[in-house]
Amino acid sequence: MSDVKSRAALAALFVACMIGLGLGLYAYFHGPAASGMRRETITLTTSAGPKAISAEIALSGPEQEQGLMFRKQLGDDEGMLFVYQRPQDITMWMRNTYIPLDMVFISSDSRIAHIVEGAEPLSERIISSGGKAQSVLELKAGTVRRLGLATGDRVAASSLASVP
């Protein structure tokens, strides 16, 4: 009889651990600011005036590799800013990214250099900066049009100002 009780206790412990693991993984991949990256207000100065976006800042290689992968939602005025140490030809893709995105490539003088609207979720097609850029702002698809963003518009963020 005690053998049955100990097996039942082990089974209950196993189930509890699996539920805890599942909830932890869900929170990690789907929670707001799931990555734990710091947030910053990004000011986009358009012909219609300034617009503010709250963005997670991806500075390190692992943060940039993770990006918005596995996220199921992104707010209308939220995004992720990828900041690189020097201007370069930047390539992105949508592998494991479930949210359609607009990608705003930003030059070293903090101006929008190139825009790609409506990047297809889960696509492995390469998305290029179309020339040298120093950062990329990923936004929920439709945000570029809604805010009236255009090449040449200015982008202000303390993360951009701190890059050498």
What are these regions (language model features)?
Residues 2-14:
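Membrane-entry signal-anchor segments at the cytosolic-membrane interface
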Residues 11-24:
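Hydrophobic membrane-insertion alpha-helices, especially the h-region
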